[in-house]
């Protein structure tokens, strides 16, 4: 593989990190006390031209953990009227995270990346809930970096002058259905599309690959 082609790989593009897009729906803003109710993850892949695309999607409704706080306003906002309804088909936090991490590890290994990194819109929020769930479930092997993220709110503010997901997507020329918003599945898919669009646009403008140092050649 030539130096130029080597640069057009997921491993090279993100310094060995494997980007995974995540969105959570919750019963409040406090990751320590409020329930995690829904989670979705979308992995990414890079084609032979160095363009980034969504790859696999995994999604779960999640049962509130024992003693979890449920804020009425949060439930009204995300449309989850009864978190305990059997019709949700919810699983435990541990079941959801283990299945998500199994997929991430498999695709991370295939991409020859050393660690996963979370991509999310206002990523600190999503990462805080995932980290809190990891602690509650006493999960030792967590693929995500504990604090580093790619935040599409920041990136879209730079690229499109918009930080709200719906407005950023529309400014980027994407379709966005406000009736579907605040579903972890829909929001993750749109965040993945937005992130890929920003990365690919930067490449098209000549921002990547970087000019290789002579020593690296």
From Swiss-Prot:
Stored CDD domains: RNaseT
Active site: 182 (proton donor/acceptor)
Cofactor binding remark: Binds two Mg(2+) per subunit. The active form of the enzyme binds two Mg(2+) ions in its active site. The first Mg(2+) forms only one salt bridge with the protein.
NCBIfam families in the record: RNaseT (TIGR01298)
Protein name per its UniProtKB record: Ribonuclease T
Organism: Vibrio vulnificus (strain CMCP6)
Gene Ontology BP terms: DNA replication proofreading; tRNA processing
Site (Important for substrate binding and specificity): 29, 77, 125, 147
InterPro entries referenced in this protein's UniProt entry, alphabetically: Exonuclease_RNaseT/DNA_pol3, RNase_T, RNaseH-like_sf, RNaseH_sf
GO cellular component, one term: cytosol
EC numbers, comma separated: 3.1.13.-
Binding site for Mg(2+) 2: 23, 25, 182, 187
């Amino acid at each position: 593989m030539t130096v130029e082609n080597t640069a057009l790989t997921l491993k090279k593009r993100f310094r060995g990190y494997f980007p995974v897009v995540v969105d959570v729906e919750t019963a409040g803003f406090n990751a320590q006390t409020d329930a995690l109710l829904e989670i979705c993850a979308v992995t990414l892949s890079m084609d032979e031209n160095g363009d980034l695309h969504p790859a696999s999607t995994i999604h779960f409704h999640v049962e509130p953990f024992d003693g979890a706080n449920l804020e009425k306003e949060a439930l009204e906002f995300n449309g989850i009227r009864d978190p305990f309804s059997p019709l949700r088909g919810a699983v435990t936090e541990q079941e959801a995270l283990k299945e998500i991490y199994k997929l991430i590890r498999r695709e991370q290994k295939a991409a020859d990346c050393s660690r996963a990194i979370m991509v999310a819109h206002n990523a600190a929020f999503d990462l805080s809930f995932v980290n809190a769930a990891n602690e509650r479930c006493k999960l030792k092997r967590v693929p995500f970096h504990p604090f580093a993220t790619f935040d599409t709110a920041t990136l879209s503010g730079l690229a499109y002058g918009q930080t709200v997901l719906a407005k950023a997507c529309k400014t980027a020329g994407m379709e966005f259905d406000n009736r579907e918003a605040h579903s972890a599945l829909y929001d993750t898919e749109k965040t993945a599309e937005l992130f890929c669009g920003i990365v690919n646009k930067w490449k098209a403008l000549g921002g990547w690959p970087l000019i290789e140092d002579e020593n690296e050649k």
